[in-house]
């Protein structure tokens, strides 16, 4: 079975669009882009367009690659204090001279729709309500729920320990809630006995950032595999590259119980959860 993200994202987004159409005012999403990284330009354009399509007011705020931390903090402060803005997203990665943590911490937790502010991360770890969850982990759990894949008591192996995916996803999966409550093993590319552990997992989340890292020899035939990675690999086509995930899809798909494709799996879910967080922020500010 293929775990395609498009129908799941469509269900989430249609609900948001309907609710926005019944609202007297529109939520606002500000997307901050520093520099001119081509991939980041594509992602920013996609997020702004999706928000606009849903009926939100969305704008990209662009700063040059030599922008100082002071420049960025001034912009964020202005957006924090703008009552028409309900969500602020700073596109990562940032130019190397900038402190990403300082930028993220400058965003008001109430407008941190990426869910990366330490306060929102802390609420997530403590199991407290009211914060925003990071979009990709939230999207993964939504994807699994849509396909009626149970998590309660299951062994989930998360390969990757980033602050954006691996760590928050592990915390979300372990929450004492009937819809999660999984037994989680958090791994990385240098973990000892990696294959031995993965073969015991009911669900494998690959978020290690290494193309084709998870091979069919590393999983069991009953495994459900979610591929978070996206990498460009040289190919003999018009683009000169092809997109692949962290999973060796062509071989894994023949062995596992279910797998998410790249592209078309987790990607649409990340954007959908960003829109959901922005809408939730708007509703909180209006209540």
UniProtKB/Swiss-Prot annotation:
EC number: 1.5.1.5, 3.5.4.9
Pathway given in the UniProt record: One-carbon metabolism; tetrahydrofolate interconversion
Keyword Iron: no
InterPro entries the UniProt entry points to: Aminoacid_DH-like_N_sf (IPR046346), NAD(P)-bd_dom_sf (IPR036291), THF_DH/CycHdrlase (IPR000672), THF_DH/CycHdrlase_cat_dom (IPR020630), THF_DH/CycHdrlase_CS (IPR020867), THF_DH/CycHdrlase_NAD-bd_dom (IPR020631)
Listed GO MF terms: methenyltetrahydrofolate cyclohydrolase activity; methylenetetrahydrofolate dehydrogenase (NADP+) activity
UniProt keyword terms in alphabetical order: Amino-acid biosynthesis, Histidine biosynthesis, Hydrolase, Methionine biosynthesis, Multifunctional enzyme, NADP, One-carbon metabolism, Oxidoreductase, Purine biosynthesis
Function: Catalyzes the oxidation of 5,10-methylenetetrahydrofolate to 5,10-methenyltetrahydrofolate and then the hydrolysis of 5,10-methenyltetrahydrofolate to 10-formyltetrahydrofolate.
Protein name per UniProt: Bifunctional protein FolD
Species: Chlamydia caviae (strain ATCC VR-813 / DSM 19441 / 03DC25 / GPIC) (Chlamydophila caviae)
